[in-house]
A protein has these predicted regions:
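Bilobed "Venus flytrap"/periplasmic-binding protein-like clamshell domains
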Residues: 21-44, 51, 108-166, 170
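An extracytoplasmic/periplasmic, membrane-proximal ligand-sensing/linker region
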Residues: 163-172, 176, 180-191, 196-198, ...
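Extracytoplasmic small-molecule ligand-binding "clamshell" domains
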Residues: 23-24, 29-76, 223
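Pocket-lining segment of extracytoplasmic ligand-binding domains
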Residues: 77, 88, 152-245
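Ligand-binding clefts/hinges and TM-proximal coupling segments of bilobed small-molecule sensing domains
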Residues: 129, 133-146, 211-281
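Sec-dependent N-terminal signal peptides
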Residues: 5-18
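Pocket-flanking alpha-helical
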Residues: 53-92, 165-167, 182-190
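A structural signal for short loop-to-beta-strand junctions that line the ligand-binding cleft
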Residues: 92-105, 218-226
Length: 308
């Protein structure tokens, strides 16, 4: 089908972004940073200047966003409520209702790794030493959810992934958790001395996460596929009543939607499982929700939105 082009007079057509648009991500060797670099590249083709900021994780991302130091942030959806509560308690910032989902991105797999043959299921982590990533990061938040739901009392430690793997090799740790879009480059560098630990199906987790598998398709060293869950991630922004901010958000989202095929072909592998055309009616940012709905309607009829 030949894609037809249509110019639509939206807010984004009335207000032109005049300054760089900042997005908080995560460590510069993680999936968020790579995804944001892809976004930066496609946005540049539309004349949008996106600056990618590396961070320690979700706690820092939401704090930077809530205090206005960045325009947007990539965050795991299960982290928003948890981190908002922490920031309200520790720093007096009430951010939950002020932060909205600008664009859904993709599900991030929960990687649980061990080099011990007697640890095959998450239930076998009872009383074990488990690294849950850096303090305040999305992995630590997801780990807290898993330990609570599975009712597992483990000895948790906060470590960078490389340090955690070294400690596990030296016998000082029994397992390592990491949440990230597979394939994660540094996990891909491991070998078959390690294996993935299964996350058993759970009705509560089924309401929060997406059921999936990790194995050979993502990591060549994996000897079998292992059941796990994935955490949806999204670009989040502030619920500002500011027309220029709304214009920037809409322009950014439109550049991503219009570049979906290019991103799937040439960007990070997670774009192949992206959920960018979905939206949350209540938690979503209204200006971009409206744009996504319009995009979906026109896309289903073979039209494409272009800026005028």
């Amino acid at each position: 089908m030949v894609m037809k082009r249509i110019a639509v007079m939206l807010v984004l057509c009335l207000y032109s972004p005049v300054s760089a648009f900042t997005i908080a991500t995560g460590p510069n060797d993680g999936s968020y940073f790579q995804i944001a670099q892809d976004i930066k590249n496609v946005a540049a083709k539309e004349g949008l200047d996106v600056q990618v900021t590396s961070t320690k994780g979700s706690l820092e991302n939401i704090h930077l966003l809530g205090t206005g130091k960045v325009d947007s942030a990539i965050v795991q959806l299960d982290a928003l409520r948890f981190v908002s509560d922490v920031l309200k308690q520790q720093r007096g910032l009430d951010l939950f209702d002020a932060i909205k989902i600008v664009l859904n991105l993709y599900p991030e797999e929960i990687h649980v790794l061990s080099n011990r043959k007697d640890i095959q299921s998450f239930y076998q982590l009872e009383g074990k030493r488990v690294s849950v990533g850096t303090e305040g990061g999305g992995t630590a938040i997801t780990a807290a959810v898993l330990f609570t739901v599975y009712d597992i009392k483990a000895i948790a430690s906060f470590d960078a992934f490389e340090d955690a793997v070294k400690n596990m090799e030296q016998g000082n740790l029994d397992a390592v958790l990491f949440v990230g879009g597979a394939p994660v480059p540094f996990i891909g560098k491991l070998d078959n001395r390690f294996h993935f630990v299964r996350l058993p199906a759970n009705a509560i987790l089924d309401e929060i996460y997406l059921r999936t598998k990790l194995g050979g398709p993502q990591y060549g060293w994996a000897q079998s596929d292992t059941e796990t869950y994935a955490v949806p991630s999204a670009i989040m922004g502030l619920d500002k009543k500011d027309e220029n901010y709304a214009s920037q958000m809409q322009a950014l989202v439109l550049s991503i939607l219009n570049s979906a095929d290019d991103l799937r072909a040439n960007g990070h592998q997670k774009w192949k499982s992206s959920i960018i055309q979905s939206y949350f009616p209540n938690r979503g940012y209204e200006p971009t929700n409206q744009l996504i709905q319009l995009f979906n309607i026109l896309d289903s009829r073979g039209y494409k939105i272009v800026k005028k």
